Amino acid sequence: MTDHVKAGPGGVMTDEVGVITGDVTLTTEPAADGTASVRIQYTGAEEWYTLTGSPAPLPPGGLAVFHQHVVEAVEAGGAAEVPDTLS
């Protein structure tokens, strides 16, 4: 799943380059082991980064619920990471 969003104040934390801010594109991809990975990039850029906390276990609601929680965290900002508790 992919969405284009504006990172909230304080941006989002990536493993590779630290905090990124502004307009970003994020994508969540499920894995066979019941986890999902989250990658993020500046919208229109070529480089993708790993959102800190990824991969993470999928919640009972599956990928759509996981993706929505991540979108909400990114929109909230504050050096957002993949939320620890997804239920």
Model-assigned labels for residue ranges:
Residues 1-27:
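Negatively charged, low-complexity tracts enriched in Asp/Glu with abundant Ser/Thr
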Residues 47-49, 55-87:
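Mixed-charge, Lys/Arg-enriched low-complexity segments
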Residues 32-49:
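A short, structured beta-strand/loop element
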Residues 28, 36, 40, 67-74:
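Amphipathic alpha-helical interface segments used for dimerization/assembly
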